[in-house]
Amino acid sequence: GYQKVMPAKDVLNLVEGVLTYSFEEAMLGRSLKDFPAMMCIRYGKSCLPIILRYLDQEHAYQFILADFATLEDWRLILEWLSALARQLGNEIHDNLGTSYDADSIFSFDYENYLLKNLQNLEQDPDLHQYQLQGFAHPVILDRELLRKILDSAQPLEEFSQVVKKVQYSSAFFSQVRFYRQNETGGIIGSYSLTEDTDTVLPRVPFVPAEFVEKVNMDEIIDWKVNLVEITGNPDMPESYKPVAAVNLEALLSALDSSEFELLDANQIEIKKLSKERLLQLAQV
């Protein structure tokens, strides 16, 4: 018979620690069918969001998880599906048509599924860089990193750790800005690096998806990093003073190996730099 669609918050509360960052908490008392889709995570564990929505025509709750979700993401979705199936007394159907109940869903071989996905990606002849969209930050994979992961003693744990480290990094992820140079008409891509601030910069810069229609790679004549010093109270915007704009590649080449670490195939986390070191780097 017909079952009333559960309020969004009741679906979220079926398993401990799940939240959505798509909507304000005050809205979650409404029926799940009132929402187009929700991005859901278990903060501290999740890396890729689970997309939750109610399909009105099928009278079904749909959960979507990306192909390259981490082990923790998979464990969460199975736990959640099981809890909902138990609550509703319904079966679970995957996208291949296989059916499970609240207990047998735990037999789904997600480890083999994830391993095959990683192997297939590594063997893709067209692979240059592959971007996963985590709930907080993108993660960049390339063949070299995938080989390192697949050659490790526990590839799935290794992969999950790479993704998790990026999602939960406390560093500032510098976002590129573009501006056109008056003299040449060329475009400059510009990042920032502030004194005493852990900062993530790309090894190889690129035009993010949201700028692709406005910025042509062929027009970019330089990639710069604005170095910023703090001259007073760090809580006051006027304390932040630009020192110099240096070439990104030159800056990264000038860093000592102890001053940064690679997060993934393209993102570098630069450890907090002192004012003295920042002023040195302004000369590169």
Regions found by a protein language model. Give the residues of each.
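Short, extreme N-terminal segment that most often corresponds to the first beta-strand
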Residues: 1-38, 129-150, 280-284
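A generic structural motif
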Residues: 25-32, 92-101
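Aromatic/basic-lined ligand-recognition segments
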Residues: 107-228
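Short, highly charged C-terminal tails/helix-capping segments
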Residues: 94-114
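Acidic, low-complexity cytosolic segments
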Residues: 73-98
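Intrinsic-disorder/low-complexity loop/linker signature
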Residues: 45, 184-185, 267
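Short, intrinsically disordered low-complexity segments
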Residues: 7-72, 226, 233, 237
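Extended, charged low-complexity segments
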Residues: 215-284
